[in-house]
From Swiss-Prot:
Disruption phenotype: Mice die at around embryonic 7 days post-coitum (dpc). Conditional knockout mice in the hematopoeitic system leads to hemolytic anemia, a reduction in blood platelet and erythroblast development. Cardiac progenitor-cell-specific knockout mice die around 12.5 dpc and lead to abnormal cardiovascular development with a reduction in cardiomyocyte proliferation. Mice display increased NKX2-5 mRNA but decreased NKX2-5 protein levels, respectively, in the heart at 12.5 dpc compared to wild-type mice. Residues 1-54 are annotated as: Disordered. This is ATP-dependent DNA/RNA helicase DHX36. It comes from Mus musculus (Mouse). Residues 258-310, 491-550, 631-690, 842-853, 863-893 are annotated as: Necessary for interaction with single-stranded DNA at the 3'-end of the G4-DNA structure.
Length: 1001
């Protein structure tokens, strides 16, 4: 098949011999449907025979048809000028001739001043498709070797450095370690720390703990917060090995659920051992892109759970590790649940491996059962008594009367928070409704009538911030000194409570230090949490659940438990994430209570009634049951853990079959898995990258299209967090600064790129400039530095896989197109598709605004923090977004305006259709553009060549040589990039193409 230009183009507008274009979903529909009808209806009026509701339905139908026609007329026009059209025809004919004849095309099209696309197609041999199919399994195995050629190069995965060190027994080292420990015992610093350690409940159980661990392969240790299990158990094991003359054989790795925990615990243990952390001493830590490694043997390493999962790719048996301690497993995060199952399998091959599971008290038995009823041991906690108060106690104590506007929610949601359909929640809601009258009746025997009346009046489905403010005021005026810790579900509650307190003259004085604690807050503010206040100053910390386990604030005496916690769930039926404030679990409530009473007797105020307390879940739902599974599915395949569904079925709490099937379907649509659920070459690359699959695909395309540096900035931000902070009281200024950084890009992603590049420039000029820049634009320098480190890690992965030739994200060869905003947007589209939304201008009476729709959800909203939230002057009708989440509404997070060519070349399947008088080209049947049919066929042909080229690049990665103008790679990519770059800013709306040969330019 050849592509003919103008003179020999076939009558139907398509390539010669192509036949008539298909006429699918854009079909015209019947003429006059919904028109005036019969009878005396006319001039747009309804037919006379219609009555009542029928009239309303008639007008609604007519308005729908009117809207559809308006939308049809607003379709953007896909166009190209005659010169580009002729060049693309020649390019496609030449490539087609190369395929048909398997010989080199001698046509020369390249002329730099004429936008030509190469001179000839190179004579590289193509892989025979039949041979590829026959050798698919062998090819995938070879592909894995090609994809991760790190050990053959100078690149070493720094996060795996500790694992890859040898761990052979060494008698002379054993003796040295013993002598070193004996010397320590005479060190005044060590002796001083021993006095503290001996006060911990765990210290008195040292022999019992060590004997149990030495005599069993798996041990479960439970213990209250503050008992010393995290800091002491690892030291007991190490010292026991050293004292028995086996120190070199001991290599302990202890997982932590959070980065901050891994660092702070490692530093604490090092201090107790009279050492510095890392630097070849006995204790160190490893988190992503940051480490202080201990000595090779006779050591303790604290690390995040993800580090061990990463190690398993290099050494599936963790050969150099003697003890694995899985800490805080009661939190049930996704990674720790998966690691438990992997370790359970590993025990069959590593009979010498010791596994210690450490959990809160309440559910230790469940972990023991999962590991074949292994032995358990409990370490008692050490806290002062804490008095607990329920909502009715608080109302009675402070004589609280709510605003008259507050009314009970009439059980409109009860336990069914958000939009998550959980049967057990519905059952508890029914029980709550049933028991409520009897509970109120019983309360009247113990509390004043006014208290019970207030309790009935309140909408306890909401967090009553006025009540919390009144309670804080009561504590300050009536109770003894001591810090106050308030638990709230999210940023909006924290911000509002802060404003409520600061609106009162009393709290504006220097007698109070009010500290909001949230991931959006500047880090410098959060460090104040740990500092003791001067005499006469009361600390008030307003925090999310980060303060439950991740950090310890020693001087807290009063805890106010708001009773709610923000949880993300994944709705498999509607394929959408939801975030809502759920009731806390009993385990959460216990942890919160435990934050008081660390230094003296404490008080804990729970903002829910006794009936609610009795029906709380024992624990939060494990993360694996409320999150998308795509990234995990790729990990299962790259670690060779067997079939995805089979492996997941063996977890402690397996996810639903619907969630597993949906994730596998998404990965197949992304071409990461084939029909046999095996990794494709693209899937191998995506599994190796430490990001979710869509972001991984964006990274690969950033390398292929040579706009690496900005794309890595975007990828790092999406997989970690953006660098913006929101100081309380300055939200509007922060929004304005963010829009200033957007620079008319209509893109949250490019706003982050601009912020990052500005920071790099300021940093080059010196520390003062960097500090001023971050202050002016409300940026976190710590987060920006983390993004910088992550970009380096991504670039090293790409180097190891062969996609780039340098480990520097700023390598000039990998950034030829980094200054072109439109190409970067195309790469964003390539990664995030099919997360597409349609923009429709809505000319209201008061002001111009836009409405945004997605294919599956209908009307949605752009998130208020987006630079596009108030934008009305879009160049195109389409947005690509990173995340869609339902809270109070369905919001799109991190969105970018994209052009028609971005969607045509990097979207889904293309079809060419007719819609009444319009010739159209559609992507996945719903993203529709006007286009002369011959132009549509050229675009489709060019897209086919791009798909073929990308497949070859993924199967055999190597950088594009843009200097080799004879190559097919360079010719095809140059043609596509040229069309994207020259796409007009605005496409005329409400106008059909001028003629078959006409163009909008």
């Amino acid at each position: 098949m050849s592509y003919d230009y103008h003179q020999s183009w076939s009558r139907d507008g398509g390539p010669r011999g192509s036949g008539q274009g298909s006429s699918g979903g854009g079909g015209g529909g019947s003429r006059g449907s919904g028109g005036g009808g019969g009878g005396r209806g006319g001039r747009g009026r309804h037919p006379a025979h219609l009555k009542g509701r029928e009239i309303g339905l008639w007008y609604a139908k007519k308005q729908t048809q009117k809207n559809k026609e308006a939308e049809r007329q607003e379709r953007a026009v896909v166009h190209m000028d005659e010169r580009r059209e002729e060049q693309i025809v020649q390019l496609l004919n030449s490539v087609q001739a190369k395929t048909d004849k398997d010989s080199e095309a001698q046509i020369s099209w390249f002329a730099p001043e004429d936008h030509g696309y190469g001179t000839e197609v190179s004579s590289e041999k193509k892989i025979n498709s039949e041979k590829k199919l026959d050798n698919q399994e062998k090819k995938l195995l070879n592909q894995e070797k090609k994809t991760f050629r790190i050990t053959d190069k100078s690149y070493i995965d720094r996060d795996s450095e500790y694992l890859l060190q040898e761990n052979e027994p060494n008698l002379s080292l054993d003796q040295h370690l013993l002598e070193d420990l004996q010397r320590k015992k005479t060190d005044p610093r060590y002796i001083e720390m021993q006095r503290f350690r001996k006060k911990l409940p765990s210290y008195g159980m040292q022999k019992e703990l060590v004997n149990l661990i030495n005599n069993h392969q798996v041990t479960v240790i439970s213990g209250e917060t503050g008992c010393g299990k995290t800091t002491q158990v690892t030291q007991f094991i190490l010292d026991n090995y050293i004292e028995r003359g086996k120190g070199s054989a001991c290599r302990i790795v202890c997982t932590q659920p959070r980065r901050i925990s891994a660092i702070s615990v490692a530093e604490r243990v090092a201090t107790e051992r009279a050492e510095s952390c890392g630097n070849g001493n006995s204790t160190g830590y490893q988190i992503r892109l940051q480490s202080r490694l201990p000595r090779k043997q006779g050591s303790i390493l604290y690390c995040t759970t993800g580090i061990i999962l990463q190690w398993l790719q290099s050494d599936s048996r963790l050969s150099s590790v003697s003890h694995i301690v899985l800490d805080e497993i009661h939190e049930r995060n996704l990674q720790s649940d998966v690691l438990m199952t992997v370790i359970k399998d590993l025990l069959h091959f590593r009979s010498d491996l010791k596994v210690i599971l450490m959990s809160a008290t309440l559910n230790a038995e469940k972990f023991s059962e999962y590991f074949g009823n292994c032995p358990m041991i409990h370490i008692p906690g050490f806290t002062f008594p804490v008095v607990e108060y329920l909502l009715e106690d608080i109302i009675e104590k402070i004589r609280y009367v709510p605003d008259q506007k507050e009314h009970r929610s009439q059980f409109k949601r009860g336990f069914m928070q958000g939009h998550v359909n959980r049967q057990e929640k519905e059952e508890k809601e029914a029980i709550y409704k049933e028991r409520w009258p009897a509970y109120i009746k019983e309360l009247r025997t113990r509390y004043s009538a006014s208290t019970v009346d207030v309790l009935q009046m309140m909408d306890d489905d909401k967090v009553d911030l006025n009540l919390i403010a009144a309670l804080i005021r009561y504590i300050v005026l009536e109770e003894e000194d001591g810090a106050i810790l308030v638990f709230l579900p999210g940023w909006d509650n924290i911000s509002t409570l802060h404003d409520l307190l600061m609106s009162q003259v009393m709290f504006k004085s220097d007698k109070f230090l009010i500290i909001p604690l949230h991931s959006l807050m500047p880090t410098v503010n959060q460090t104040q949490v740990f500092k003791k206040t001067p005499p006469g100053v009361r600390k008030i910390v307003i925090a999310t659940n980060i303060a439950e386990t991740s950090i310890t604030i020693d001087d807290v005496v009063y805890v106010i438990d708001g009773g709610k916690i923000k949880e993300t769930h994944f709705d498999t039926q509607n394929n959408i994430s939801t975030m809502s404030a759920e009731w806390v679990s009993k385990a959460n409530a216990k942890q919160r209570k435990g934050r008081a009473g660390r230094v003296q007797p404490g008080h804990c105020y729970h903002l829910y009634n006794g009936l609610r307390a009795s029906l709380l879940d024992d624990y939060q739902l494990p993360e694996i049951l409320r999150t998308p599974l795509e990234e995990l599915c790729l990990q299962i395949k790259i670690l060779r853990l067997g079939g995805i569904a089979y492996f997941l079925s063996r977890l402690m709490d397996p996810p639903s079959n619907e969630a597993v099937v949906l994730s596998i379907k998404h990965l197949m649509e992304l071409s990461a898995l084939d029909k046999q659920e095996e990794l494709t070459p693209l899937g191998v690359h995506l599994a190796r990258l430490p990001v979710e699959p869509h972001i991984g695909k964006m990274i690969l395309f950033g390398a292929l299209f040579c706009c690496l540096d900005p794309v890595l900035t975007i990828a790092a931000s999406l997989s970690f967090k953006d660098p913006f902070v929101i100081p309380l009281g300055k939200e509007k200024i922060a929004d304005a600064r963010r829009k200033e950084l957007a620079k008319e890009t209509r893109s949250d992603h490019l706003t982050v790129v601009n912020a990052f590049e500005g920071w790099e420039e300021a940093k080059r000029r010196g520390f003062r400039y960097e500090k001023d820049y971050c202050w002016e634009y409300f940026l976190s320098s710590n987060t920006l530095q983390m993004l910088h480190n992550m970009k380096g890690q991504f670039a090293e992965h790409l180097l190891g896989a062969g996609f780039v030739s340098s480990r520097s994200p700023k390598d000039p060869k990998a950034n030829i197109n980094s200054d072109n905003e439109k190409i970067i947007k195309a790469v964003i589209c390539a990664g995030l598709y099919p997360k597409v939304a349609k923009i429709r201008l809505n000319l209201g009476k008061k002001r111009k605004m836009v409405k945004v729709h997605t294919k599956s959800d209908g009307l949605v909203s752009i998130h208020p923090k987006s630079v596009n939230v108030e934008q009305t002057d879009f160049h195109y009708n389409w947005l690509i977004y990173h995340l869609k989440m339902r809270t109070s509404s369905i919001y799109l997070y991190d969105c970018t305006e994209v052009s028609p060519y971005c969607l045509l070349f990097f979207g889904g399947d293309i079809s060419i259709q007719k819609d009444k008088d319009q010739e159209i080209i559609a992507v996945d049947e719903w993203i529709v553009f006007q286009s002369p049919e011959r132009i549509a066929h050229l675009v489709k042909g060019l897209r086919k060549e791009l798909d073929s080229l990308l497949q070859e690049k993924i199967e055999s990665p190597h950088p594009v040589d843009w200097d080799d103008t004879k190559s097919r790679d360079c010719a095809v990519l140059s043609a596509i990039l040229d069309l994207i770059k020259t796409q007009e800013k605005a496409t005329p709306r409400n106008l059909p193409p001028r003629s078959q040969d006409g163009y909008y330019s």
